A protein has these predicted regions:
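Active-site and adjacent substrate-binding regions of carbohydrate-active enzymes
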Residues: 2-644
């Protein structure tokens, strides 16, 4: 017979206690004490500043107290494996800055059907050398795809979209990824919700508590002031800033699409609840949170509602909250703004905000350089990046899920005789293949017939000419297109920061025009580069004579060199050489007494180039060694020369 105290873990007799001592309660107690000490130490480090900023913004001590209580709850609920990972990353420092990091961005359904399907494809991702996977939006959205904005109209922040899987699937995928040294990134859409979100449905029903979480307005003069002062996000496809709701007789703010209601971060309940969503997702094993449209989150009448000081207050609080509960998690800011407006989102070295930012301007400037065969603006952009503190880390990319907006430095370009409107028109014509000599293919997005402004959509391979060469059956043109594609990836890998490849680019996948046959997608040309991953191409990756084999093999080799060579360290010294020929981009990286001369030819002509001095160099790609002062560089080619 078992004593009731024994069932509770209390020995029934001294003899039994001596025979079978229970150490588990003591172990649990010690583990709990250690966890308490870790949490309280982190909270003490940030509490005063966090409270100061919160009270400055909201002046609500009760809501701040609730927030702190919830931080403890989410910390307690954080799985032990993730807590251990947090501690390892705290000891290691900025893990995302390691030179061996390589990202890949993908849509779950296009790549593998479901989250479980992605788990089944991890061997392929490892083969690609991927250490960071950005899963495009997978949270629940309206079933009508024309109202989902590709996943950016979230209906439920704690539910995976049916058909893709479950939160349990996500947590399991994160666990399997961590076993392989792969981190997971997701989009945290914090500016707005879908109009089908519970908050929006209750607001539409007239519940004041939920109406206060959005911006409702009935005064036409106020709406007119917003229209006057705030730039439109989609002036042609979704003009205006408000959507009228006849059942309420009011307008609700919708800066993006009418079905995406802007959240009111003036309400502390909105901030708190969104932070709880953030921490819930972090506790599923997400390593990197991409803060979508973060510059837009604070609205103030009489301003342009972009990049306001309160935005930085919120991001700084998010950084501290994550460092208390889940310090292994990285904040990645999506700031599609002019360079002068991007850098402040790093915060300061003493009071950091985002860990990483998208290098949007450099991406757009790179493609402008391809079209113009002139690297001067790109040099200027890279020099500005090099002048920043080395702790500031950019996520570098050639293409992503989104369109390319030509947000270039037109103040500089106009000084060189390139005016904004005709230059943008030239770029869009060039990449559509409408300019003589262009082999690019793609489509315009959100074209404005009045101003002539538009954004551009295509895959990397199609922009480099792979699609056009394949359709023409032109082997010589294909050689040039593939050389250009490889050169651009070599340039990507030569930059400091975390390089990320869009899924399919490693196999030179071209545009997919089938979206035109889908009524729910036909009006959104961004789907031209959001096609399904073509698994039939993977079999050609081992064929060095195929386009896929040439790209895959080249990227595999370049990524391996980057992993092994210390000159690619994030803390290496980087200089942009002002070479006399504007078609040449020259990046010099130095570390540990070794120097890399990374040289790129953005032109259709072979170039004869001069080193700074005669010396002995090793070509890191071919392995050739020799002493020389001059060298030739074919059109759209590159060299990685190492000098010891």
């Amino acid at each position: 017979m078992t004593d009731k105290n024994d069932r509770a873990g209390v020995p029934a007799s001294g003899a039994r206690a001596r025979r079978s001592p229970s150490r588990q309660p003591l172990a649990r107690s010690a583990e709990r004490a250690r966890a308490d000490a870790i949490f309280l130490g982190r909270l003490r480090r940030h509490h005063d500043e966090l409270r100061w900023l919160y009270m400055e913004l909201y002046d609500n001590a009760d809501m701040f107290g609730e927030l702190v209580d919830q931080l403890r709850r989410f910390y307690d609920e954080r799985p032990a494996a993730l807590r251990a990972l947090d501690e390892r990353r705290e000891r290691a420092g900025a893990w995302y800055r390691e030179r061996g990091q390589l990202g890949m961005q993908m849509y779950i359904d296009n790549f593998a059907g479901t989250i479980a399907g992605v788990e089944g494809r991890l061997d392929y991702l490892e083969r690609c050398g991927v250490t960071y996977v950005h899963l495009m939006p997978f949270l629940d959205t309206p079933t009508d795809r024309s109202r989902s904005d590709g996943g950016y109209a979230v209906s439920d922040f704690r539910r995976v979209k049916p058909g893709l899987g479950t939160m349990e699937d996500l947590a399991r995928l994160a666990e399997r990824c961590h076993e392989r040294g792969i981190s997971l990134c997701m989009d945290f859409v914090m500016n707005h919700t879908s109009d089908e979100h519970e908050w929006a449905r209750r607001a539409r029903a007239g519940e004041g508590e939920y109406m206060s979480r959005y911006f409702f307005e009935s005064r036409q003069d106020v709406i007119d002031r917003y229209t006057r002062d705030v730039p439109q996000v989609f002036p042609t496809t979704a003009p205006g800033h408000f959507t009228y709701l006849p059942e309420l007789g009011q307008h609700v703010m919708t800066q993006f699409y009418p079905y995406q209601w802007d959240l009111n971060y003036r309400n502390p309940r909105v901030f708190n609840e969104m932070m709880y969503n953030f921490l819930f997702l972090a506790n599923q094993g997400i390593d990197v949170m991409r803060l979508d449209a973060v510059p837009y989150i604070w609205k103030q009448l009489g301003t342009n509602c972009r990049n306001l000081p309160q935005v930085h207050t919120i991001v700084r609080m998010m950084r501290m909250i994550s460092e208390v509960v889940c310090p292994g998690v990285v904040l990645l800011g999506e700031v599609v703004m002019a360079p002068v407006e991007v850098v402040p989102y790093f915060g300061t070295v003493e009071k950091p905000e985002c860990h990483m930012l998208y290098n949007v301007t450099t991406m757009a400037t790179t493609w402008s350089t391809v079209a113009c065969r002139d690297t001067r603006l790109l040099r200027s952009q890279l020099e500005a990046v090099c002048a920043l503190p080395r702790a500031y880390t950019f996520l570098n990319y050639l293409r992503c899920h989104d369109d390319i907006g030509w947000g270039l430095d037109y103040a500089t370009l106009s000084g060189w005789g390139m005016e904004e409107v005709p230059h943008k028109r030239y770029l869009n014509d060039y990449f559509q293949g409408l300019v003589p000599g262009s082999t690019s293919r793609g489509e315009l997005y959100n074209a404005d017939p009045v101003t002539g402004d538009a954004r551009f959509c295509a895959t990397t391979a199609s922009m480099c000419g792979v699609e056009a060469a394949a359709l023409a059956g032109d082997g010589a043109a294909m050689d040039v297109a593939l050389r250009k594609d490889v050169m651009l990836h070599a340039y990507l890998l030569a930059q400091s920061g975390l390089p990320i490849i869009y899924s399919g680019d490693e196999l030179a996948q071209v545009n997919d025009y089938s979206y035109r046959d889908d009524p729910e997608r036909a009006d959104d040309s961004r789907y031209v580069h959001r096609g399904r991953f073509d698994w039939s191409l993977v079999g050609r990756a081992d064929d060095p004579g195929s386009a896929q084999g040439r790209i895959f093999g080249a990227l595999e080799e370049l990524e391996g060199i980057r992993r092994d060579e210390a000159v690619f360290d994030a803390d290496a010294s980087v200089e942009i050489v002002n070479y006399s020929d504007p078609a040449i981009l020259w990046i010099r990286r130095s570390a540990g007494g070794r120097t890399l001369e990374a040289v790129f030819n953005f032109s259709d002509d072979e170039k004869n180039l001069w080193m700074p001095a005669r010396a002995r160099f090793t070509d890191l790609v071919s392995g050739d060694e020799g002493e020389f002062e001059t060298f030739s560089l074919p059109a759209w080619d590159f060299r990685w020369y190492l000098r010891a």
